[in-house]
């Protein structure tokens, strides 16, 4: 009986949270400018944008909140990819980013390597090999799993010191290659 009395306030508190309406209303939508690409020109650049945790539901929620308009709608090409990992049902950004960066599945927590831990070539590597200028722009740390998938190689995304060292050597190597091409 005492236990029931002690749990009653917790249950009532939880019930009141469930009854509370959970909505977000954007008082004024963000203005979205329509961008029209020039006609008849060959496409010269590719920009791959990866939003962290950006599922279709997240995009749809943002689109709905902004009354059916997003800057993303200006993108000429939008794609989906299945980024599940090789050894687990649910992926992480290390394995998921590696799938995007290299086109190959890898193990959970791996960054830029195959299932045996061997380095994989990324889109950045392939473009650079064709003499294209490349770059990685981030709003997080470069050694965070998703950007690291494009320029680093490690079986453990948490091995930050090794990944930082790999990114520094990669950046130095790429700078040397760029100077050589000039």
Protein language model regions, located:
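Bacterial Sec-dependent N-terminal signal peptides
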Residues: 1-16
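Active-site nucleophile/metal-coordination loop of metallo-enzymes that catalyze phosphate/sulfate
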Residues: 21-42, 56-158
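Short hydrophobic beta-strand that contains or immediately precedes a catalytic carboxylate
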Residues: 46-51
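Mature extracellular/periplasmic domains of secretome proteins
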Residues: 125, 164-169
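Conserved small/polar residues in nucleotide/adenosyl-binding loops
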Residues: 171-178
């Amino acid at each position: 009986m005492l236990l029931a009395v002690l749990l009653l306030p917790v249950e009532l508190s939880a019930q009141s949270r469930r009854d509370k309406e959970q909505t977000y209303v954007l008082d004024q939508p963000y203005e979205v400018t329509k961008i029209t690409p020039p006609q008849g020109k060959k496409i010269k650049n590719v920009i791959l944008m990866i939003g962290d945790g950006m599922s279709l539901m997240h995009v749809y929620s943002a689109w709905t909140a902004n009354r059916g308009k997003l800057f993303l709608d200006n993108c000429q090409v939008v794609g989906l990819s299945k980024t599940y990992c090789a050894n687990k049902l649910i992926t992480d950004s290390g394995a998921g980013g590696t799938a995007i960066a290299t086109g190959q599945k890898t193990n959970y927590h791996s960054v830029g390597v195959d299932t045996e831990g061997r380095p994989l070539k990324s889109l950045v590597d392939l473009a650079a090999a064709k003499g294209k200028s490349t770059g990685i722009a981030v709003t997080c740390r470069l050694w965070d799993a998703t950007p690291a998938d494009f320029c680093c190689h490690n079986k453990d995304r948490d091995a930050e010191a090794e990944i930082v060292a790999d990114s520094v050597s990669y950046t130095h190597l790429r700078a040397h290659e760029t100077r050589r091409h000039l």
